[in-house]
Amino acid sequence: MSAFELVTELSARFKDAVLGEQMTADRFPTVWIRPDATIDVHRFLRQEIDRPFKMLVDLWAIDETARKHRDGLPPSGITIASHLMSHERNADIRIKIALDAEYPRAKSIGSVFPNAPWYEREAYDMFGVEFEAQPHSLRILLPPGWEGHPMRKTQPGRATERPLFNMTASLFDAKEHALAADPEKFGLPTHRDGVELMILNYGPHSMATHGVFRIVLALDGEEIVAARPDIGFHHRGAEKMAERQTWHNFLPYTDRVDYLGGVMGEMPYLQAVEKACGIKVPDRALTVRIMLSEMFRIMNHLLFYGTMAQDTGAMSPVFYMFTDRERGYRVIESITGARMHPGFFRIGGLSMDLPDGWDRLVREFLDWMPSRLDDYEGMVLRNEIFRARTKGIAAYDTAMALDWGVTGPGLRATGYAWDVRKARPYAGFENFDFEIPVGHAGDCYDRTVVRVEEIRQSLKIIRQCVDNMPSGPIKADHPLTTPPPRERMLHDIETMIHHFVSTSWGPVLPPGEYTGQVETVRGLTQFALISDGEPSSYRTRIRTPSFAHLQMISAVAPGMMVADLVAYLGSIDYVMSDVDR
C-alpha cells in the first residue's frame, strides 16, 4: 500500500475526522485530524490496519503562533505531532492535531502506545499542553517549581533575557524537598502483601547510573517491586538553542546531543537541511562521512564493552579497550583536527579534505583491532562470571521493544534485524557490504554480543571506504555550501548577492518541514526541522534513542535484583545528554 492509498484508507475510515494531508519534502504522509479522533485514529493505525504501525517513534509539540508560512494548514495555536512507524511496511506516517494556543488540551494516547507518557510529559513541560489521563503535573526535563514553558515563542531564548536568578536559602530548601523520593508523587507502592517497602533513591550520583540520572525504587529486600526513572538533570535546551542559531551555526551543537557519537549526530541534521535545499553531496564527501561515522561507532562500542565488563565485576578489560580507543581517536584527530566533537561535516559536504597519509593511519587501526576483539571475547563474553551476570537478565522480546520505541542494538538483540542503514540506506550505505548482527534472547548478554559484532561490521565498512575512496570534490557546488570561486564573482553580480546573504544573515532554507533519520550508535536518531523562510530554524525536534530506552526501565526492572539493575543499565548504553538534550 502506497502512502497515497494509506491516506485514502484513513480518510474513508474516519471521514470527517481527517482534515487533510500536508505536503512536505518527506517520503511519508503527514495527516491532520480532529483532536477528538486522536485515540481512535492511533488505535486504528496500531491495531486494526494491515501491517500496522506498531511503534510510536516520537511525539512533540509546535508553537504555531509566530509562524508565517503555513498556507493551506488548519488553524492552530499549538500543534501536536506524533510520528508512527510500521517496520513491516518500512513506512512512516505523521499525525497532527491543532490545539488552542492559550489553553492547549489533548487526549493522551498512552492507552494505545505504552511509550507515549514521557513524550506527552515533555510536551507539557516545554509547551504547557495538558493531556487527559496523564500525570502532567510532573515535569520531566525541567526542575519542580520552574515557571512557564520555555519552548513557547513568548519565552526568552537566552539566559541573559531572563530575570536574575538568586538561590536563597528558602528556595534551596524548597527545591530539595521537591526532589525527595515521595512514593505518592512517583506512583510507587508502599506495601506488598502487608510488608512495607523500602523507597530508595538510586542515583543521580551513582557510578552505576552512568551519568546524572536517578531511579526511584520500591524494594522488598533486594527485589525491585517498582521503578520510576527520573531524568532532566542534564537538560541544556538543545532544541531552543536551534531557534537562536543559523542553520550553519547549529551544526556543532549536534555533536553534543550524544557526546560519544561524534560526527554521527551531524548526519540526520544535515540530511534534513540538504533535503530542504536540494543539495547533492559529492561521492567523496559521502564516503568520508560513512568512514568517520563508523569510526565513532567503534569508539562508542569499545567504551560500552569495557564499562559493561566493569559493571559486572571485571576490572582489566576497560583499560585494554581504552588503549584501543586512544588509537582510534588518534586517527580521528589526524583527519578532523579534534577527538570527540569534530564538527567536521558541513552543509553539502565536509569542512576539509582528507590529509596526506590518512589511509595508512586507518589501515593500521583496521589491522590492529580484529585480534584485540578475539582476546576480549575470551576475557568477557566467554567469562563465566560475566555470563552468569548477563544471561537471562533484563530480557524482553521484539513486541515489547516495539511497544516502548526501542531501536538500535536493543531491538536487534531480540532477533529483529532492523537497521536504518539497510532498511532506508542513506549517504551511500546501499553500496557497502555488511551484515546486521542480531541476538535471540533480548537479554543483557545478547545486547553485548550484538554491539561487539557491530564493531566487526564497522571495521568491514571502513575497509571498503579506504579501498574504494572516490576522488573529486568534498563539497557541493551550491551557494549555501561554498563561497563562490573568484572567476565567478568577477563574472556576475548575482553570485555576489548569494554570497553576501549567506555570510551576513546565514543561509535561508525554503519554508517547509524536513526530516532526517540515521542509525546512530544507540539507535534511530531523527531531526524534524521546520523552516519559516528565515536564517534560523522555526522548530527543531530532536528524537533520540536513549530517551525511549530509559522510559522502558519501569517495565523491565520489576522482579529483578538491585545487582541485576546495574547490568541492565550498562546494557542499555545510554548517554544522559542524548536523553535530556
UniProtKB/Swiss-Prot annotation:
Pfam families: Complex1_30kDa, Complex1_49kDa. GO terms for molecular function: NAD binding; NADH dehydrogenase (ubiquinone) activity; NADH:ubiquinone reductase (non-electrogenic) activity; quinone binding. Keywords: Cell inner membrane, Cell membrane, Membrane, Multifunctional enzyme, NAD, Quinone, Translocase, Transport, Ubiquinone. It comes from the Bacteria. Its EC number is 7.1.1.-. Gene3D superfamilies: Cytochrome-c3 Hydrogenase, chain B, NADH:ubiquinone oxidoreductase, 30kDa subunit. NDH-1 shuttles electrons from NADH, via FMN and iron-sulfur (Fe-S) centers, to quinones in the respiratory chain. The immediate electron acceptor for the enzyme in this species is believed to be ubiquinone. Couples the redox reaction to proton translocation (for every two electrons transferred, four hydrogen ions are translocated across the cytoplasmic membrane), and thus conserves the redox energy in a proton gradient. It catalyses: a quinone + NADH + 5 H(+)(in) = a quinol + NAD(+) + 4 H(+)(out). Residues 1-172 are annotated as: NADH dehydrogenase I subunit C. GO terms for cellular component: NADH dehydrogenase complex; plasma membrane. In the N-terminal section; belongs to the complex I 30 kDa subunit family. Residues 196-581 are annotated as: NADH dehydrogenase I subunit D. It is found in: Cell inner membrane. It is a peripheral membrane protein. The keyword Transport applies. This is NADH-quinone oxidoreductase subunit C/D. It is an enzyme of class 7 (translocase). SUPFAM superfamilies: HydB/Nqo4-like (SSF56762), Nqo5-like (SSF143243). PANTHER family: NADH-QUINONE OXIDOREDUCTASE SUBUNIT C_D, NADH-UBIQUINONE OXIDOREDUCTASE 49 KDA SUBUNIT. NDH-1 is composed of 13 different subunits. Subunits NuoB, CD, E, F, and G constitute the peripheral sector of the complex.
